[in-house]
């Protein structure tokens, strides 16, 4: 007999029959719930409060639950109703922002009653097996065996043996969730895009990215591209992941083309023509099938050469580097995560993070998924968080330990260079690593060459075997880390 309020665009029984999962229908019917729906997202947009649904939903809650307190009164002087108290709090909270903002919130409170729809639950829902189908889980053992049960609120059923004894968890698991929570997602207008990559730069969730496709590459029919600026021999595309997008609209807001279109329209008082914009926020259903497939294809594209995408050259080029922080659980439009994302684009393949407890520990390390991921070589950030609010000391200790390990490793590599006096290539490789060990890019090249030499020698049976194996065991320290 309880009441269930659902914020969705499906405000008819017919729509709910199609969109609700069978299990949810079964539970609602068996519990004899009073089902109410309201499209708070649409209402908020109409009122100029895009994405701000809490006031509408709170008003709807009190409208449904009048046994808690009177919802409204015919007496305008009655201050003890839900509507009067909510409006009082709206004025108290927003009056410093101006009368227009206060009135928007008043309108949001008043809109709930007139837009609330009660759905009579049919008896057939108690046993039905019809409804929205379950999404197929990603083909990843850890996600299927550990993450999915936790997301389904069945984590208590997992044995302790399902987890690593040291508490570490695999990275790069948010990409398997594909939550599809956005109501509106950006649609790329290929004709208007100026290829500035600002949309990617500001995206808090790394769900919209630029891609370069080498000329002559066979691409799917729907994967439209245009000649790339400043990248001869390549075509350009902006691709969104509709099922990972949070629908915040920051990309569309920052787009210079969109801003110009808005300014031009303002001069005449006309509405902005969608055709004049490079990014338009459109319903998820319009794009999801086509763009989800395009996103999956984009992940198979080869990385563009570094001379084309020199990530330290400028902001635009930095966005062609793979973000190693993606699809976090941060709030839609988060202002922190774009910085974290860009850091991983610049330094992520050698990053070690001593995290400070706060939002960054929630969107960065919430169980059961991890937004930090790896590149195609398997390199990415290592992340840890201390709950003692001592991340400076925590990170300092990591750095001291790392330096001690590297200094010891340097001595071992120097000793190996002496032992390899008759192995010219190996000796030169050891010396090259020692010379470049404190240079970020130089140590990458030298480390890769040294590992090849170590792998060719570690089981050859010579007197260097033990030393080679010791160095190889600590190959994670060969590339200079960024703390």
Q: Language-model segments: what does each one mean?
A:
Residues 16-17, 47-49, 249-251, 365-367:
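Short conserved micro-motifs at the rims of enzyme active sites and ligand-binding pockets
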Residues 86, 90, 95-245, 252-482:
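Ferredoxin-type iron-sulfur electron-transfer modules and their immediate structural context
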Residues 1-148, 218-222:
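Active-site cofactor/cluster-binding pocket
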């Amino acid at each position: 007999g309880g009441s269930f309020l659902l914020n969705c665009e499906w405000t008819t029984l017919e729509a709910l029959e199609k969109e609700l999962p069978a299990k949810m229908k079964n539970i609602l019917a068996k519990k004899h719930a009073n089902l109410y729906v309201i499209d708070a997202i649409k209402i908020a947009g109409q009122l100029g409060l895009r994405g701000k649904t809490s006031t509408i939903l709170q008003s709807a809650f009190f409208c449904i639950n009048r046994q808690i307190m009177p919802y409204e009164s015919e007496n305008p002087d009655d201050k003890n109703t839900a509507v009067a108290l909510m409006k009082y709090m709206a004025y108290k909270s927003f009056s410093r922002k101006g009368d227009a903002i206060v009135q928007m919130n008043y309108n949001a409170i008043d809109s709930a009653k007139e837009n609330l729809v009660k759905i009579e639950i049919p008896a057939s829902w108690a046993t039905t097996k019809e409804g929205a189908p379950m999404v197929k889980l990603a083909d990843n053992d850890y996600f299927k065996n550990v993450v999915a049960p936790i997301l389904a609120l069945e984590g208590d059923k997992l044995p302790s043996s399902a987890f690593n004894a040291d508490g570490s968890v695999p990275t790069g698991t948010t990409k398997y969730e594909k939550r599809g929570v956005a109501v509106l997602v950006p649609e790329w207008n290929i004709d208007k895009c100026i290829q500035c990559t600002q949309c990617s730069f500001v995206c808090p969730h790394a769900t919209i990215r630029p891609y370069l496709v080498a000329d002559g590459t066979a691409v799917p029919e729907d994967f439209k591209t245009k000649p790339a600026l400043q990248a001869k021999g390549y075509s350009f595309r902006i691709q969104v992941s509709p099922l990972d997008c949070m629908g915040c609209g920051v990309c569309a807001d920052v787009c210079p083309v969109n801003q110009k279109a808005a300014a031009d329209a303002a001069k005449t008082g006309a509405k902005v023509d969608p055709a004049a914009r490079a990014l338009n926020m459109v319903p998820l259903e319009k794009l999801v099938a086509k763009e989800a497939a395009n996103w999956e294809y984009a992940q198979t594209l080869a990385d563009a050469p570094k001379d084309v995408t020199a990530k330290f050259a400028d902001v635009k080029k930095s966005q062609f580097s793979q973000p190693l922080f993606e699809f976090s659980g941060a709030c839609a439009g988060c202002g922190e995560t774009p910085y974290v994302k860009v850091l991983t684009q610049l330094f992520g393949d050698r990053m070690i993070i001593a995290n400070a407890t706060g939002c960054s520990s929630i969107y960065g390390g919430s169980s059961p998924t991890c937004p930090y991921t790896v590149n195609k070589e398997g390199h990415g950030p290592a992340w840890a968080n201390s709950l003692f609010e001592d991340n400076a000391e925590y990170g300092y200790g990591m750095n001291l330990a790392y330096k001690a390990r590297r200094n010891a490793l340097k001595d071992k590599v120097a000793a190996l260079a002496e032992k390899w006096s008759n192995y010219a290539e190996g000796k030169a490789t050891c010396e090259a690593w020692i010379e470049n060990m404190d240079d970020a890019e130089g140590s990458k090249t030298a480390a890769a060459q040294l590992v090849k030499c170590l792998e060719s020698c570690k089981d050859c049976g010579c007197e260097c075997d033990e030393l080679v194996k010791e160095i190889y065991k600590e190959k994670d320290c060969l590339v200079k880390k960024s703390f």
